[in-house]
Amino acid sequence: MAERPLDVIHKSLDKEVLVILKRGAEYRGKLIGYDIHLNVVLADAQLIENGEPKKSYGKIVIRGDNVLAISPVEIE
């Protein structure tokens, strides 16, 4: 049986994710919360530009309307 999108997000709780926004901004951090509207809460969030951290934040909330994609980050 195929996984549903929210199942993948749920499995990513307390793990590092990359959130890509509609206007192209990217944030990486530990996913500590989400809801059915894809509002997400990241801890230890970083704004990513050109693949590199540009600015660090503590905890941030990203409104689901702005989210284009949420991807688990593979830690090597």
Swiss-Prot record:
<dbReference type="GO" id="GO:1990904">
    <property type="term" value="C:ribonucleoprotein complex"/>
</dbReference>
<comment type="similarity">
    <text>Belongs to the snRNP Sm proteins family.</text>
</comment>
<dbReference type="GO" id="GO:0003723">
    <property type="term" value="F:RNA binding"/>
</dbReference>
<dbReference type="InterPro" id="IPR010920">
    <property type="entry name" value="LSM_dom_sf"/>
</dbReference>
<feature type="domain" description="Sm">
    <location>
        <begin position="4"/>
        <end position="76"/>
    </location>
</feature>
<dbReference type="InterPro" id="IPR001163">
    <property type="entry name" value="Sm_dom_euk/arc"/>
</dbReference>
<dbReference type="InterPro" id="IPR047575">
    <property type="entry name" value="Sm"/>
</dbReference>
<dbReference type="GO" id="GO:0000398">
    <property type="term" value="P:mRNA splicing, via spliceosome"/>
</dbReference>
<dbReference type="InterPro" id="IPR016487">
    <property type="entry name" value="Lsm6/sSmF"/>
</dbReference>
<protein>
    <recommendedName>
        <fullName>Putative snRNP Sm-like protein</fullName>
    </recommendedName>
</protein>
<dbReference type="InterPro" id="IPR022901">
    <property type="entry name" value="snRNP_Sm-like_arc"/>
</dbReference>
<dbReference type="GO" id="GO:0120114">
    <property type="term" value="C:Sm-like protein family complex"/>
</dbReference>
<keyword id="KW-0687">Ribonucleoprotein</keyword>
<dbReference type="Pfam" id="PF01423">
    <property type="entry name" value="LSM"/>
</dbReference>
